[in-house]
Amino acid sequence: MVSWKGIYFVVALFLGSFFGSIFMLGPFLPLMFISPAWYRWITDRIVATWLTLPVALLEMVFGAKVVVTGDGFIPGERSVIIMNHRTRMDWMFLWNCLLRYSYLRLEKICLKSSLKSIPGFGWAMQVAAFIFIQRKWEDDKSHFENMLHYFCDIHEPLQLLIFPEGTDLTANTKARSNDFAEKNGLRKYEYVLHPRTTGFTFVVECLREGNNLDAIHDITVAYPQNIPQTEKHLLNGNFPKEIHFHVQRYPIETVPTSKEELQLWCQKRWEEKEERLRRFYEGGKCFDETGQSIIPPCKSELRVLAVKCISLLYWTVFPMGTFALLYLYSFARWYFAAMIIIFVAQQKIFGGLELIELACHQYFKKQQKHDDTKMKKK
């Protein structure tokens, strides 16, 4: 049954992303045609302000507790984050961890392409340059390569979240994973799915070659009580009471360089996850005996609390302010309508704002190369 908590959560996130895309991100869209690097720098920080809202709602309104154990992050470092995909919402819950131990503005997520069509959420994800995939490697490889080369070219640090399992853990996906294991003589898993290593190895190789990778963060996520498997569970008010993250940091120098060894390395991490999660769910429902966060965060809890309070206040007032603006001023209504048309039309015509941004960067890069060639001839 749909609950008021779920409705409040979804409506608050939607209004924030919808009006934020139009009134906060929209004015900066022309900047991508002048300087894609500056456009990326500014919009990453604007999007990060919205990413604090789900964190604030989950913890301050719905009382979710976050526990982080393991190695933690070095603030500002460039990394690939690999995580088990227990629910469809793991990527959002990870923001509760990153707010404390890293910087939300650095995160990019690899997501299925259908999500970019969602008004508000999808528009903001396009502006944030998330990597949208079709889940067909022959179609995704060139897009992956172009986006990763872009991030390397502009020297903007990123922490790229990918789910090697490819989908969340359900009875159906576990059955398919077990069929795969049986055909290939592998162990059947109970708490994770067998990882698909092709995309992972490609991402690591690309970022490594572009000198844009400091470490790999292997994160195991678990929910000791209620598990919100889908968006419907959140709408029904089934929010996680506790979210546990166990972080293992591997400096890139310690990670294998060959493709075959990297595949085995990833598979080994999943074997460890299976055992770690087995101990978690069959034992004391914690990754560490204390059941408490043991990693010193890069931000104090007082600072995190201040960020959450400001976020909750701002994203409550902001939609009301935009409603008032639209009611009082005709130019705001014209701008509002124009931006909706632009967001919808550009995706129909060009496929997404991240592709336009990428094309602009490639154009400027080509022009720079042409100018450099002319200078050398002189």
From Swiss-Prot:
Give the EC number(s) under which this enzyme is classified. 2.3.1.-, 2.3.1.51
Tell me yes or no: is Amino-acid biosynthesis among this UniProt entry's keywords: no
Instruction: Give the matching InterPro entries.
Output: Acyltransf_C, Plipid/glycerol_acylTrfase
**A Pfam family name for this chain?**
Acyltransferase
Q: Which UniProt keywords apply?
A: Acyltransferase, Developmental protein, Endoplasmic reticulum, Lipid biosynthesis, Lipid metabolism, Membrane, Phospholipid biosynthesis, Phospholipid metabolism, Transferase, Transmembrane, Transmembrane helix
Share an example GO biological-process annotation for this protein.
Answer: phosphatidylinositol acyl-chain remodeling
GO MF terms, alphabetically ordered: 1-acylglycerol-3-phosphate O-acyltransferase activity; acyltransferase activity
Task: Write down the top EC class of this protein.
Answer: transferase
Q: Name one GO cellular component term.
A: endomembrane system
PANTHER family named among the record's database cross-references: 1-ACYLGLYCEROL-3-PHOSPHATE ACYLTRANSFERASE-RELATED (PTHR10983), LYSOCARDIOLIPIN ACYLTRANSFERASE 1 (PTHR10983:SF16)
Task: Tell me which family the UniProt entry assigns to this protein.
Answer: Belongs to the 1-acyl-sn-glycerol-3-phosphate acyltransferase family.
Domain comment in the entry: The HXXXXD motif is essential for acyltransferase activity and may constitute the binding site for the phosphate moiety of the glycerol-3-phosphate.
Q: What is this protein called?
A: Lysocardiolipin acyltransferase 1
